[in-house]
Amino acid sequence: MAQYRVVLLPGDGIGPEITAVARQLLDVVAQRHGFQLMFEEQPIGGSAIDATGEPLPASTLTACRSADAVLLAAIGSPRFDSLPREKRPETGLLGLRSGLELFANLRPVKIVPALIGASSLKQEVIEGVDLMVVRELTGGIYFGQPKGRIEADGDERGFNTMTYSASEVDRIAKVAFEIAGERNNRLCSVDKANVLDVSQLWRDRVDAMAPRYGEVDVSHMYVDNAAMQLVRDPRQFDVLLTGNLFGDILSDEAAMLTGSIGMLPSASLGSDGPGLFEPVHGSAPDIAGQDKANPMAMVLSAAMMLRIGLKQSSAADDLERAVDAVLASGFRTGDLMSEGCTPLGCQAMGEQLLKAL
């Protein structure tokens, strides 16, 4: 029997509640499909500050590095807003990404038929949307040097540097090509090559890699047009590949096609070692401990972990089908509630998901 070590990071706010739901479901599908998940919980974020004084204890990072996958719930609490920026809960996540050398962020966006009315776009525009945004996570303008603010000639100037090396583009492009090959063999690389030298390099490297993935249809799109096309005709996209800045913006735009951030999972991957899987939503401290949280993004993040991190696609399919079935039956948490549906709390939603398995 295959065995996998999974580090659970419940974190802050609603994190412990949604982690409990995901863990129950993971145990069921693991038993059904003949593998074993060995869970280890570790503190991160505000809970780690309370326990150790640090947002990312060394013991947490060590445990994550030796795991097969890491499943994170949520980080953040206004209780710590008065701390120096480097001591706040959110720096725990940044440190974890750095410590695991994660460079590829994956954001799937799929329209669930039962929730199609939740989108702000017309049904005929978003029906059938199923795309993946692949964002480079560690380079580009957020990390480029030099950067800063200076005063010269009586004027203040701020500056940042947008830079990518060929090797940085190659490794993220490889991830995107492989994902496209596992999906529908369509890859759209998004850049600003009509203006930026760094984007011209990006486009050249993507084109250079394309012959190695001959079955994948490659196209290019300027980022301003891509932002428009995501709203005008999102069905045209399968896999979107882009850099850190453009991906930061486009992934949030794509997320809102669904109408609820409470349904969106994500993954961050490196070249080696475990991936990090987490919901897109935050810690929602205003509803923490009240049994109001929506656990579905956490469950779908667990499904991504099974599919991508542990190569257990059949078990992942079970979790995704359970989510679809529960929603089709009219069960909703408060963030998804609409007329004629049945309201449920976090625990009760978990019970319905278990029944749907």
Curated annotation (Swiss-Prot):
One Gene Ontology cellular component term attached to this UniProt record is:
cytosol
Tell me, which GO biological process terms does this entry list? L-leucine biosynthetic process
Catalysed reactions, as listed in the record: (2R,3S)-3-isopropylmalate + NAD(+) = 4-methyl-2-oxopentanoate + CO2 + NADH
List positions binding substrate: 97, 107, 135, 224
SMART domains per record: Iso_dh
E.C. no: 1.1.1.85
- Spell out the residues of the site Important for catalysis: 142, 192
Q: In which pathway does it act?
A: Amino-acid biosynthesis; L-leucine biosynthesis; L-leucine from 3-methyl-2-oxobutanoate: step 3/4
How is the quaternary structure described? Homodimer.
Protein name per the record: 3-isopropylmalate dehydrogenase
Q: Which gene encodes it?
A: leuB
